[in-house]
């Protein structure tokens, strides 16, 4: 199972009332969303400074990319039947951002990276996460990052700013280079500047979006047999 502790972004009106999760008034939108005036905000900002003290060391599926990792922040699209169809990813609850820390049990340090999920229907085989390294490499690399990585208990920070249609990401840590990325969330150009033909051409343009500060452990533990 994936154990988790999350703080979900919610909005309140001028009287302190929290709108329904079925209302755009409890989500933010990209600037190019055709109904952007119905949302609580255009764009969003999320910042955190944190330390990861523990990750799973006993993963049943140790060869799977999420093993030995923890999600420490994300932006999520809402799961909404009215938006959902078999052509686009709108309404399927995909994630334009998941920030990971991953450390193998025998490694000195761990890696920090972020993933962008192609915005496609749930049963589309092309729907996958694209990893972008921050310190160390992405989740497919099992080499020890050594001094380039982040140790357990070592502090690092991230700042995520969705402005207009673009998501700006800044990662910083003492004795490590500051790393910046950006990606337009309303087209299918990836964070390296290349067109991704598998992604929806307008990416997350029409989705209802919200942020999460999270600690989600991505490992299925091997349970003892009796």
Predicted features by range, described:
Residues 1-122:
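Secretory/extracellular carbohydrate-interaction modules
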Residues 2-22, 131-139, 143-145, 178-206:
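A signal for specific C-terminal beta-sheet/loop modules enriched in small/flexible residues
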Residues 39-41, 149-153, 162:
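Surface-exposed coil/turn segments at beta-strand junctions on protein surfaces, enriched
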Residues 148, 161-226:
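Aromatic sugar-binding interfaces of carbohydrate-active proteins
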Residues 45-49, 157-159, 168:
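Beta-strand secondary-structure signal
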Residues 107, 115-157, 178:
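Short, aromatic/His-centered strand-loop micro-motif at the edge of beta-sheets
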Residues 112-116, 160, 169:
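Generic structural motif
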Residues 98-99, 114, 130, 156, ...:
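Intrinsically disordered, low-complexity segments enriched in small/polar residues
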